Amino acid sequence: MKTEILKFCMAKGILLDREVGEVLSEFSEETAKEIIEKVSMLKGKIINRNFFCKNADSLKEIMPEGGFEKLCINLGISIEISREISPINAESVVESESMNHRRNVRVLYSSSNQTKKIEVKDFTKYFRVRYSMMRTVLQERPELENLTSINKISNQKQSFSIIGLVYGKRVTKNKNLMLEIEDLTGKILVLINQNKEEVYSQAQDILLDSVIGVRGSGSREMFFVNEIILPEAILREKNYLDRDECAAFISDIHIGSKMFLEKNFLKFIEWINGDLGDNKQREEALKVKYLFITGDTIDGVGVYPNQEQLSNIKDITEQYQKLASCLSRIRNDVSIILCPGQHDAVRVAEPQPALGKEFAWPLHELDNVILVSNPALVEIVNEKKKGVKILMYHGASMTPIINGVDSLRTIKAHDTPSKVVRFMLKNRHLCPIHSAVTYIPNEKVDELAISDVPDIITTGDLHKPDVDIYNNILIVCSSCWQSTTPFEEKVGNHPEPCKVPIVNLKTRAVKIIDFSEDEEIEEIKTCEEKGSELVCEVKGEKKEEVIVK
């Protein structure tokens, strides 16, 4: 690509795709600049193959005789078809299949950017909304017999159940566990005896601000717990696509960091385009019609102290330009659904809105990119039946949850992030504990509650690939595209970069493909459902079957 053309594009604020740049280099410098000048007049910010399809008429007028045909041939655009049906319809011919795929993506929930002033009363309303939503779920559970409100509990001993929000938690001098629970009518102390091992173990993992149901006996003075019931996200019926299509799940690309594994990321893009691997691998790659990117797409600027020492791109917009340049290479029939994370150019408080045009304008120029909030709920639709719902959440709450839950901290859940997601599903909430993440309270709905149960939940943040199944919900945790940072070494994290989970949406079978090697790609794990379990075969471990319950 000629340096003069690149400099001219930069002066015009235009991002030039590598493939188009190489084609333009075959024209005279004057003609190439004329084309770029025309692009800037059309308010195009990215010059790629798709742009030439859309603006065929305008570009024909300024190009020399035969030049348009030459450019189209080199870019792989079918000019024979466009001549038969007119240039205007060329776009629909080239993009008809990809547009169908974008119509198959329905955004069910994506939070907007609130501008309202937040007051103390908004937090009060927020917790009341959370309680009411969880109570509606819990009161359907048959285990909660004789359900009553706290203000209706008498001083006489009796058996009953209550639903409340955990206001306090402490260990008594006799090593029993005491919870203070509140509902909209009052508070009550409940005791979990250490001799009831199963209930006691369950109670140890309860976080403050969780909404739970308890069954037992007692009076207004003291209530003794026999059973704890959590809200539990339960998928009653699994949903499958009618079409044989797959979804790939990635996150934590961290473009702009010196640790960004660009070569491996481009290798993944080459694979998804069907240009890498043996015939079977290429065939499987072309089944991927959806790419979910779950946050931390760039490394950002000023996210943590002295970050600039580890950055090779120190401007946020330039980081997004680089990201857009990479994503623009992905074939156009792949719908890319992208939500932000803590390193992206949006507010840190959750729910985080979709990436805006101020810094991430290059992404808005890509037709096959769908920008959603964090969290977001997306459906891949079927024609005549329910589609497959996918809940995206980057996962800022995962580390605070691990630190606050004994059982997760003990098993070092940073290495098995699906266990943290299981905890979220049990509590039906992405961040049960107040202050674990900064959030914006909504007086109408708890946007971090799992109100609509998904078929698949996908997360990132911990830089470890992992898959699991819980209550029929498929859990997919993404890897990263960044080598180990000094911070991760300091805290003892062990990232596994360049590993991509692929889910067949027709069968719900899962593969994890490794792009970390220089020469070849390898399926390192394959999983299939058997009833309520996910049976996985891990390559290189004597083909043992690992049962994930």
Where are these regions (language model features)?
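Extended recognition/assembly regions associated with phosphoester-bond processing machinery
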Residues: 1-549
